[in-house]
């Protein structure tokens, strides 16, 4: 059973007060990453054990609905997946994800499913299974319908929604396992192109899909990002543009569907630098 806490603007979350103009909803779902049998005994990394109860037992989902959201057309659900040694609450605060989302003016709803909590782990848990992401999306929609944020439909169909996947660092894995199992039109990666190449290339072969990948020199994604960009052009024959970050502007983002951006920022700095998250959300190609 879903357990829900409804949070409005000027709310208290984990002991810290916030005053965003939109609406927050927190609930739990059986269709998040964890608990999962593959992490029932926790996970070992670099000589340290990360136990299941602390790191792989949180099934929370946090939703943010911006102040001026309008439920017209196919609602855009943007799922953000956090990286290593983070959780949904620390990630959205550290990277200013909600404030940038609000500032972008994007008519969409932001969804944070909990991942490996405060653990160095990219494993996507149950969301790596074929049908689970759509079940999670259904749970999210149900929460929004119950609050009359979205109109209630007779039945849930994933094709009625415009799905975006985004994330940082270790989020690459869960995103790669979802994007070919459900209709996804847009992916935004922040220094996360570590692997899953075969999954990404399959999805990138569609010229209509929008992909933004910003990567750094020392984040471990440089070589693979360059390789993927070359394969898109040489093997898939799909237009792609590769630029250094100073060249990025609204026109460039609005004119290209496959964009690779080299940044001189740090691995954790690429999201907030010049409000990149807001910039990428605000400026999208016409569809």
Q: What is the role of each PLM region?
A:
Residues 216-287:
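C-terminal catalytic histidine-bearing segment of alpha/beta-hydrolase fold enzymes
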Residues 74-77, 81-144:
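Active-site machinery of serine-nucleophile hydrolases
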Residues 92-101, 194-205, 245-247:
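Alpha-helical scaffolding within the catalytic cores
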Residues 158-206:
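Primarily recognizes the serine-hydrolase "nucleophile elbow" in alpha/beta-hydrolase
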Residues 4-13:
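Sec-dependent N-terminal signal peptides
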Residues 125-169:
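Gly/Ser-rich "nucleophile elbow"/oxyanion-hole loop immediately N-terminal to the catalytic nucleophile
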Residues 19-77, 108, 239-248, 256:
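A domain-start/cap signature at the N-terminus of enzymes
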Residues 115, 188-196, 216-220:
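Active-site nucleophile loop of the alpha/beta-hydrolase fold
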């Amino acid at each position: 059973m879903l357990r829900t806490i409804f949070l409005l603007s000027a709310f208290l979350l984990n002991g810290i007060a916030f005053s965003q103009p939109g609406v927050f909803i927190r609930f739990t779902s059986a269709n998040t990453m964890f608990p999962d049998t593959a992490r029932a005994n926790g996970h070992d990394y670099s000589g340290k054990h990360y136990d299941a109860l602390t790191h792989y037992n949180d099934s929370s989902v946090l939703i943010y609905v911006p102040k001026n959201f309008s439920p017209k057309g196919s609602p855009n659900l943007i799922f953000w997946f956090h990286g290593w040694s983070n959780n949904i609450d620390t990630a959205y605060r550290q990277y200013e994800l909600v404030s940038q989302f609000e500032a972008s003016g994007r008519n969409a709803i932001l969804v944070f499913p909990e991942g490996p909590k405060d653990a160095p782990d990219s494993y996507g848990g149950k969301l790596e299974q074929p049908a689970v992401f759509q079940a999670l999306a259904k749970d999210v929609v149900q929460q929004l319908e119950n609050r009359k944020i979205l109109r209630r439909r007779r039945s849930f169909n994933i094709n009625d929604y415009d799905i975006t996947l985004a994330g940082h660092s270790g989020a690459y894995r869960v995103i790669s396992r979802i994007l070919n199992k459900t209709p996804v039109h847009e992916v935004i990666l922040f220094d996360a192109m570590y692997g899953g190449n075969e999954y990404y290339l399959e999805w990138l072969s569609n010229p209509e899909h929008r992909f933004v990948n910003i990567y750094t020199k020392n984040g471990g994604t440089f070589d693979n990002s360059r390789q993927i960009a070359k394969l898109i052009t040489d093997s898939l024959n799909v237009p792609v543009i590769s630029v250094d970050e100073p060249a990025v502007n609204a026109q460039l983002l609005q004119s290209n569907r496959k964009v690779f951006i080299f940044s001189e920022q740090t691995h954790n700095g690429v999201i907030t630098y010049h409000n990149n998250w807001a910039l990428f959300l605000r400026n999208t190609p016409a569809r």
